[in-house]
Amino acid sequence: MRARPQVCEALLFALALHTGVCYGIKWLALSKTPAALALNQTQHCKQLEGLVSAQVQLCRSNLELMRTIVHAARGAMKACRRAFADMRWNCSSIELAPNYLLDLERGTRESAFVYALSAATISHTIARACTSGDLPGCSCGPVPGEPPGPGNRWGGCADNLSYGLLMGAKFSDAPMKVKKTGSQANKLMRLHNSEVGRQALRASLETKCKCHGVSGSCSIRTCWKGLQELQDVAADLKTRYLSATKVVHRPMGTRKHLVPKDLDIRPVKDSELVYLQSSPDFCMKNEKVGSHGTQDRQCNKTSNGSDSCDLMCCGRGYNPYTDRVVERCHCKYHWCCYVTCRRCERTVERYVCK
Amino acid sequence: MWVAWSARTAALALLLGALHGAPTRGQEYDYYGWQAEPLHGRSYSKPPQCLDIPADLPLCHTVGYKRMRLPNLLEHESLAEVKQQASSWLPLLAKRCHSDTQVFLCSLFAPVCLDRPIYPCRSLCEAARAGCAPLMEAYGFPWPEMLHCHKFPLDNDLCIAVQFGHLPATAPPVTKICAQCEMEHSADGLMEQMCSSDFVVKMRIKEIKIDNGDRKLIGAQKKKKLLKAGPLKRKDTKKLVLHMKNGASCPCPQLDNLTGSFLVMGRKVEGQLLLTAVYRWDKKNKEMKFAVKFMFSYPCSLYYPFFYGAAEPH
């Protein structure tokens, strides 16, 4: 009789933990895949970290794709940290994949960005891998139907965006398609935000041209459809992060939908990131909400932006310190063909938050 | 060699330091070669590669180094693209319009493999342009946008400076023949010239006028035969005026005597007819007859050279 309460407590705890689990971006743990793992046999798929069973199955049936997806995981992390380097929340917690803190576990604005960026990155990386010939299963994107413009012609190798979107979504959305996992609201939010990421990627497809005329002239211009660089897509998504919309899960007709919390007269737009739970200010360390805090973070004394010492340090003040920097100087190119440099030391003054 | 050179430089640095009465903050020189991670520049899909300059890239195979960076500094992304675009510059190289033409072109088409891109200095670009742009203009090709000299850095220690342009001339300078008057003797050479020309016409020349830096060839009304029409219409041939760009002050043996017929090749550029080659018509010349007869059977390449000169590199 006394044993039963313990069993009930354990079940409740597991259930509580279960509802918040964000399987959708655990695959970013692939960035830690050791180079020694060749990924040329199907049994290697079981050794990969952060995958749900559907993703393991995709790994087995598309083994040649996995090297590219590992590359995508690294690219997503790098792009996220770069895009948020000047913010209090600087995406450092993404390195903890697959065991995230609550800033990414919960339905926050930050997780909205990471879901969108991950979806965009995997599709971007696959599309580019088709172009570069790294993937045997696909090749250049299709020649567009519209004419390329006067004096231009289609040529080169277009980024294969449609293949990238297809295979990317199949892999990165797989965890959200599992029926048992998580709440419906979280699932809808994550699928929506992933689709926003892919939409941003579609919008970044543009016509690029090169002069291929005689003697470098522009009498013949070869054009192709190419994607913008991943960091440009990340910058676009960051803009959407800053204007993201808080939503609630509300019945509309016979179904439940995500609708804006404050302006619930309109549906959610396809282009806007959405979140269910508000974020802290990330000033102080608080593991309950997944905040690292800004103590000991470097800040910019002369900046007016988010990396300024006033904003980054949340008014707590900052400490200056001097750092010695060794760098190359007096570099000289010699024909033919090498460069010589000297090594110079200088001191720089840096500022860290109190 | 490098070590000795470095030692001398280090010694010099120490001496200078002693003279200033304070130790210099610079230390011994380090050498930098190829690294896989790109420091700057756009890398599309892949980080830059370091490849052997292939034997079938004749523009740069003899430039003085053996390996090149890809993508190159003209954003060509494959060797096939580099070869294709470089091929139209070979005839310019053959003209020897500047002693550093190859150094300049190859610094962009097949740049050296180092941990950072090394661009040509602006002075190198300006020297090559000064030597070669008039020749290109004579054939109706402006100095291209991709080689505009303002794109390249003002001279500093990390760009490629003029290398051979400083050498003293080994022979006294001779007045150079007009580019349009250099003679091709083989049928193949003539047909290559016909490929790079818009039109080919057998005609008589009534008179020649000087117009600024150009010569103007006024065609006679009669005894005109259009061998390759190209963009010319019937009305165009009624009164033919051909411009010999930059041809006012250079010798042209073919035009010393205007009697008889001439084989003339040209291009139509912005409504103006530019002369690209002129020969005295010689009905006994078998090579010329063959070229005229089989002109349209000759396999012109898609990216034909803009001109085909008789001068060969020695």
Swiss-Prot record, chain A:
Give the positions annotated as glycosylation sites: 40, 90, 160, 300, 304
Q: Which domain of life is it from?
A: Eukaryota
Q: List the disulfide bonds.
A: 80-91, 130-138, 140-157, 209-223, 211-218, 283-314, 299-309, 313-353, 329-344, 331-341, 336-337
Q: What would be one Gene Ontology cellular-component term for the protein?
A: cytoplasm
Q: Name one GO biological process term.
A: intracellular signal transduction
Q: Which GO terms describe its molecular function?
A: protein kinase activator activity; signaling receptor binding
Post-translational modification note: Palmitoleoylation is required for efficient binding to frizzled receptors. Depalmitoleoylation leads to Wnt signaling pathway inhibition.
- Give the record's keywords alphabetically: Developmental protein, Disulfide bond, Extracellular matrix, Glycoprotein, Lipoprotein, Secreted, Signal, Wnt signaling pathway
Q: Which InterPro entries match?
A: Wnt, Wnt_C, Wnt_CS
Lipid positions (O-palmitoleoyl serine): 215
- Record function comment: Ligand for members of the frizzled family of seven transmembrane receptors. Probable developmental protein. May be a signaling molecule which affects the development of discrete regions of tissues. Is likely to signal over only few cell diameters.
PANTHER family, alphabetized: PROTEIN WNT-11, WNT RELATED
Family listed: Belongs to the Wnt family.
Q: What is this protein called?
A: Protein Wnt-11
Swiss-Prot record, chain B:
Specify the protein name: Secreted frizzled-related protein 5
Summarizing the function annotation, the protein's role is: Soluble frizzled-related proteins (sFRPS) function as modulators of Wnt signaling through direct interaction with Wnts. They have a role in regulating cell growth and differentiation in specific cell types. SFRP5 may be involved in determining the polarity of photoreceptor, and perhaps, other cells in the retina.
Q: Which example biological process does GO assign this protein?
A: cell differentiation
The gene from which this protein is expressed is Sfrp5
> Which top-rank group of organisms is this from?
Eukaryota
Q: What is the lineage of its organism?
A: Eukaryota, Metazoa, Chordata, Craniata, Vertebrata
Pfam annotation, one family: NTR
> Which SUPFAM superfamilies does the entry mention?
Frizzled cysteine-rich domain, TIMP-like
Gene Ontology CC: one annotated term: extracellular region
Q: FZ domain spans which residues?
A: 45-162
